[in-house]
Amino acid sequence: MATAGRRGGAASERRERRESRRQEASPEKSNFLERVVTINRVAKVVKGGRRFSFTALVVVGDGNGMVGVGYGKAREVPAAIAKGVEEAKKHFFTVPRVQGTIPHPVIGEAAAGVVLLRPASPGTGVIAGGPVRAVLECAGVRDVLSKSLGSDNAVNIVHATVKALRALVPPEKVAVRRGLPLEEVAPPALLRAKAEAGV
């Protein structure tokens, strides 16, 4: 009986902590886009049987060039998602964009997942499957072509997409590295935008 009482007390404490974390995080929810890519139930075999918990892969971004991916694990789905969101916010990085698309084609690989991303003209939209689309939309990429060339495992695809986005290099940096004027390496869309802005 004492053991059951301790378990009940611990469970109520966990619920209170979850509620407090949820209340603290709620004001920030409007500032970020959150996409739950996959939720998986896992089991750990212990002396008394199997103990179930949930894992959640979450993508968080500001829709304006910042994105991160997090992995959360907890006894309940909402808590796993909340942990994933916090983990994603710790791993934010900046995605170079040119007129709503990416500056150049790129391939990202993670385990057996391989993702190809290519720039697209304005109005094309995000041509991508679920996991890739979640990352690109949270990053604020509006026009892009993509193709998954490897595993269809959502976790691998998401991490491959993140690696591809991290490998992008802004045209300005390419010009400096090569010692060339920006006009020779930048996409025409960027040059037109700079001309219209008078930069």
Curated annotation (Swiss-Prot):
UniProt entry keywords in alphabetical sequence: Ribonucleoprotein, Ribosomal protein, RNA-binding, rRNA-binding
GO-annotated cellular components: small ribosomal subunit
Pfam hit, one: Ribosomal_S5
Family: Belongs to the universal ribosomal protein uS5 family.
Main function: With S4 and S12 plays an important role in translational accuracy.
Domain observations: The N-terminal domain interacts with the head of the 30S subunit; the C-terminal domain interacts with the body and contacts protein S4. The interaction surface between S4 and S5 is involved in control of translational fidelity.
Protein name, entry field: Small ribosomal subunit protein uS5
Source organism per UniProt: Acidothermus cellulolyticus (strain ATCC 43068 / DSM 8971 / 11B)
Originating gene: rpsE
